[in-house]
């Protein structure tokens, strides 16, 4: 249990989620410190900036449960020196999800789950609610912020290994249920069952995308509201006007016009995410004019359609690594840059996902002006497999395999928007390319 009279010690504090949680707890007034591998990582910068002590792993860091609350990262097992010290000293630990659940119970809490759109929707909701009332948040891109006395807690709920079943929020947005994480979930039914369990644990209301049949099939004892573009949706986006600066649209709440909203974001998925945010805010009786203002000042989530301008070349960085996400990102790029050649640099993420979605990836990349595929990013769980980037490229006319040693080939693409997409270490390819511009 969290305790302001004890030190909150993180084993693995540099992990993206752990660093976010450590920052949030520090902001809420807890005494936070932790340890990790010696290698310098970007996640430790904000921690050190606010004075959180980040040490190397050392058994001596572990004291006792009288002095410390230990939060252990999922990746660390008994061969870790501090985990071993906990076992030897009889010191109990709690997990990241256990700790987040404690924060969930302290607030009016909203979880955002789904295969795609979690980070973007969590970022937007935390931003607009933060314009209205004190709001703490935890986002999957490594950002966490706590506000003492906060009314709302907005968090990204990750379905991998059913982690989100640790949480019992007041509200939950579910963006979609497309089968993912084939290394853990057996099949679509197994994957969908995790979301049914998450729905069962939601207390006040569930908000689901109206076009997703699996979301429609979820059974709940609480109100389940749909959002989308159809007349049958409880919260419907209508009168949509798209431009190169974003999108304007009205939202009907159970038929009542809530007025026009504007977002400086691109693609249908961004309008859907915004409609889900409006639905939650409306249900919580947050003034719509405040939400309108918050939408206008939102600049987007990290690594979600992040743009840079290099004269006639625009560079977009996006986390997309599943076919649905890739299609959404490509649609958004066409909306923002209708007159530019569309070039995609795609890093397949894990061998199991690449094998499962090979035909989808090939179909999507055949539809852009030029496609490059990097070597497959191997995760720690899955070091190799029987598929390669060459297998994709041979089925995509005009495409090429690209690596750091031939990254200069990208400079041939004049008057282009170049989209780097992937969930692994694709930023290293983008960085190498940008140094040539």
Curated annotation (Swiss-Prot):
What disulfide bonds does the UniProt entry report for this chain? Answer: none
The primary location reported for this protein is cytoplasm
UniProt keywords (A-Z) are: ATP-binding, Cell cycle, Cell division, Cell shape, Cell wall biogenesis/degradation, Cytoplasm, Ligase, Nucleotide-binding, Peptidoglycan synthesis
Q: What is this protein called?
A: UDP-N-acetylmuramate--L-alanine ligase
Q: Which family does it belong to?
A: Belongs to the MurCDEF family.
Q: Which InterPro entries match?
A: Mur-like_cat_sf, Mur_ligase_C, Mur_ligase_C_dom_sf, Mur_ligase_cen, Mur_ligase_N, MurCDEF_pg_biosynth, UDP-N-AcMur_Ala_ligase_MurC
Q: Name one GO cellular component term.
A: cytoplasm
EC number in record: 6.3.2.8
Per the UniProt entry, what species is this protein from, by scientific name?
Lactobacillus helveticus (strain DPC 4571)
The UniProt record gives the binding positions of ATP as 114-120
Signal peptide coordinates: none
Could you give a single Gene Ontology term from the biological process aspect? cell division
């Amino acid at each position: 249990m969290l305790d302001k009279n004890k030190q909150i010690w993180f084993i693995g504090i540099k992990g993206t989620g752990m660093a976010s949680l450590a920052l949030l707890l520090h902001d809420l007034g807890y005494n936070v410190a932790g340890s990790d591998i010696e290698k310098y990582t970007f996640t430790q910068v904000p921690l050190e900036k606010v004075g959180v002590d980040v040490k190397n792993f050392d058994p001596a860091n572990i004291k006792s449960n009288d002095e410390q609350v230990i939060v252990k990262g999922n990746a660390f097992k008994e061969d870790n020196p501090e985990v071993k010290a906990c076992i030897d000293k009889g010191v109990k630990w709690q997990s990241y999800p256990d700790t987040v659940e404690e924060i969930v119970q302290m607030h009016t809490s909203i979880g955002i789950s789904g295969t795609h759109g979690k980070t973007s929707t969590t970022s937007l909701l935390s931003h607009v609610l933060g314009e209205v009332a004190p709001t703490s948040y935890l986002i999957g891109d490594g950002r966490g912020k706590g506000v003492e006395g906060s009314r709302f807690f907005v968090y990204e709920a990750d379905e991998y290994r059913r982690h989100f079943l640790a949480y019992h929020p007041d509200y939950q947005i579910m963006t979609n249920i497309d089968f993912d994480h084939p290394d853990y979930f057996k099949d679509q039914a197994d994957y969908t069952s995790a979301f049914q369990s998450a729905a069962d644990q939601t207390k006040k209301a569930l908000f689901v995308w109206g076009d997703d049949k699996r979301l429609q099939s979820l059974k709940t004892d609480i109100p389940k509201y749909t959002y989308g573009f159809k007349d049958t949706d409880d919260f419907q986006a209508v009168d949509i006007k798209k431009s190169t600066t974003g999108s304007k649209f009205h939202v009907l709440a159970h038929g009542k016009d809530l007025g026009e909203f504007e977002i400086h974001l691109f693609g249908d998925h961004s309008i859907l995410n915004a409609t889900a945010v409006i639905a939650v805010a409306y249900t919580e009786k947050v003034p719509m004019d405040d939400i309108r203002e918050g939408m206008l000042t939102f600049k987007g989530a990290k690594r979600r359609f992040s743009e840079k301008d290099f004269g006639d070349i625009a560079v977009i960085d996006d986390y997309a690594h599943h076919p649905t996400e890739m299609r959404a990102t490509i649609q958004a790029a066409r909306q923002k840059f209708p007159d530019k050649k569309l070039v995609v640099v795609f890093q397949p993420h894990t061998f199991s996902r690449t094998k499962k979605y090979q035909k989808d990836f090939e179909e999507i990349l055949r539809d852009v002006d030029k496609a490059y595929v990097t070597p497959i990013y191997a995760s720690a769980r899955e070091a190799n497999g029987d598929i390669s980037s060459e297998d994709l490229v041979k089925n995509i006319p005009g495409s090429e395999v690209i690596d750091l040693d031939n990254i200069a080939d990208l400079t041939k693409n004049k008057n282009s928007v170049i989209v780097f997409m992937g969930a692994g270490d694709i930023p290293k390819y983008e960085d190498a390319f940008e140094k040539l511009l």
